Amino acid sequence: MMAYLVFLGPPGAGKGTYAKRIQEKTGIPHISTGDIFRDIVKKENDELGKKIKEIMEKGELVPDELVNEVVKRRLSEKDCEKGFILDGYPRTVAQAEFLDSFLESQNKQLTAAVLFDVPEDVVVQRLTSRRICPKCGRIYNMISLPPKEDELCDDCKVKLVQRDDDKEETVRHRYKVYLEKTQPVIDYYGKKGILKRVDGTIGIDNVVAEVLKIIGWSDK
């Protein structure tokens, strides 16, 4: 089974959750660019990591050429030979073009760019309901995945907190920024004829089933 996928969608769409589920079913690796960046800046002997860490510590945006280099390095690893699910990249048309040319150099091409459609109010409800344990980092959702005891972590019995970027005003701002930044990428894949839209409100199992259908995966 070979599938090269890009996952697009607003914060709170569930991209990481769907990618993990599809990885479990198909063995196609989930590549989260957020995770790659967190890992690379921890490596003391990595020149690229050092450069990125300096930029991030100044609070500046990492330029496309460095982001592209990090992604290229990860996609060149053996586990990505027969596919990947990219989550968090590309964020710009320039990055999308770089990804295309890199895949072309490997005689590969994207199978699909999957866009999870989730309305703003649903994103707001999902993210403002999110709580985190300040001690162990476990994430809860007060609607869909609540703790056993009200507002207390099941493991630590510590009072759960809401992250600043999960407050309503911030979530609405993040959604607006997402629309502005991602629309050109959505249009880019739409013109290429590989954009597939999935309703992100139909429940995890149904969403995963839709994506598996797109890539032609069968359990049989």
UniProtKB/Swiss-Prot annotation:
Subcellular location per the Swiss-Prot or TrEMBL entry: Cytoplasm
GO MF annotation terms: adenylate kinase activity; ATP binding; zinc ion binding
PROSITE patterns on file: ADENYLATE_KINASE
One annotated Gene Ontology cellular component of this protein: cytoplasm
Region feature (LID): 129-166
KW Calcium (keyword) present: no
Catalytic activity entry: AMP + ATP = 2 ADP
Residue positions binding ATP: 12-17, 130, 139-140, 202
Family matches, as Gene3D superfamilies: P-loop containing nucleotide triphosphate hydrolases (3.40.50.300)
Major localisation: cytoplasm
Protein name, per record: Adenylate kinase
Source taxonomy: Bacteria, Thermotogati, Thermotogota, Thermotogae, Thermotogales
Gene of this entry: adk
